[in-house]
A protein has these predicted regions:
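N-terminal signal peptide c-region/cleavage motif recognized by signal peptidases
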Residues: 16-18
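Bacterial N-terminal signal peptides that target proteins for export
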Residues: 1-11
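Envelope-exposed proteins and targeting segments
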Residues: 28, 37-39, 43-45, 76-78, ...
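Short acidic/polar N-terminal linker immediately downstream of export determinants
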Residues: 26-36, 55, 177
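A short acidic-to-branched-hydrophobic micro-motif
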Residues: 66-95, 149
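Surface-exposed amphipathic alpha-helical segments
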Residues: 35, 47-50, 95-108, 145-188
Length: 188
């Protein structure tokens, strides 16, 4: 009888632990896709982002219009800024590097990596500590005269910020991911 009681107790503990673990796991992620601006990203809690017009200063000092998709919550924010740069080459790593230089001014870099999103698509990823203690995760890429800048500022270790920054996806005009699974070789 004691064996049965112990098995029943152990089963109850295991089932409770399993139920608790399930409640602690993030739910399914649904990517927000914007076909007009050709990107996708996972915003926290599947919210539709707010949209605002902004400007971007190019590597040559010109100010050009940009569109920003964003979510702000107490103590954290998430943005994707998309800049169209039609008067230059379709891919210009100098724009990516200049963007990284500007973001690096916001805090202390803990990770600064240059690589390709996919062959021929230059990119950078940054992981920084901001003066307010938040972690700033950023990635930037250029493709087809479009500069994509994803930034997430949140308390250190926030799952939503990591998922947001890592989920940025460049889309073709039909909404398909440009990442063809060929790996991410170093960019020249």
């Amino acid at each position: 009888m004691r064996v049965i009681a112990r098995i029943a107790s152990a089963s109850a503990v295991l089932l409770s632990a399993a139920a608790f673990a399930q409640t602690e796991q993030p739910g399914p992620s649904i990517m927000y896709k914007n076909l007009e601006y050709r990107f996708g990203v996972i915003f926290p809690n599947q919210v539709q982002p707010m949209v605002r017009d902004t400007t971007y200063t190019t590597k040559d000092g010109a100010t050009v219009p940009a569109r920003q998709f964003y979510l702000e919550r107490p103590g954290e924010w998430y943005t994707v800024t998309m800049v169209r740069l039609p008067n230059g080459p379709p891919i210009d790593k100098a724009h990516v590097d200049r963007t990284a230089e500007q973001i690096l001014k916001k805090g202390t870099a803990q990770f600064n990596y240059s690589y390709c999103y996919d062959p021929g698509i230059p990119g950078r990823q940054l992981n920084m500590r901001e003066p307010n203690g938040n972690q700033l995760r950023a990635s930037m890429y250029m493709w087809d005269n479009r500069l994509y800048i994803a930034e997430a500022s949140a308390p250190v270790g926030t799952h939503d910020a990591l998922q947001f920054e890592q989920s940025i996806t460049i889309l073709d005009p039909m909404g398909n991911d440009l990442d063809n699974g060929q790996g991410s070789p170093a960019c020249p």
